[in-house]
Amino acid sequence: MSNAHDIKPLNDNIGLEEAAQGFAAIGSEPRLDVLLALVRAGHKGLTVGEIQQKTGIPASTLSHHLRFLSAARLIEQTKDGRTIHNQAAFTHIEALANFLLRECC
């Protein structure tokens, strides 16, 4: 886990490998559901419990999906005591969308 201050903004020119990793992460309906919940929450983000309430995904499975999304840099996680806050990584999500528009349209 990292602090939000440690995360470097992504260049809009992401490569094929990074784009494939991002698209693979949202290729799962539950992970897409989690990401959409975080996008809707805005920069405030959600705790793991709040995500669980909004998506209905069991805690053990949710943990797996959050790790996958974090590894793909689609979400950022910060720890505050025993609470983990999750936020959509809007800069990276935008870079991923721009990659698709640039390469495919």
Task: Label each residue range with its predicted role.
Residues 77:
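Short beta-strand "wing" residues that participate in macromolecule-binding interfaces
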Residues 1-22, 36-40, 90-105:
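Amphipathic alpha-helical dimerization/coiled-coil segments
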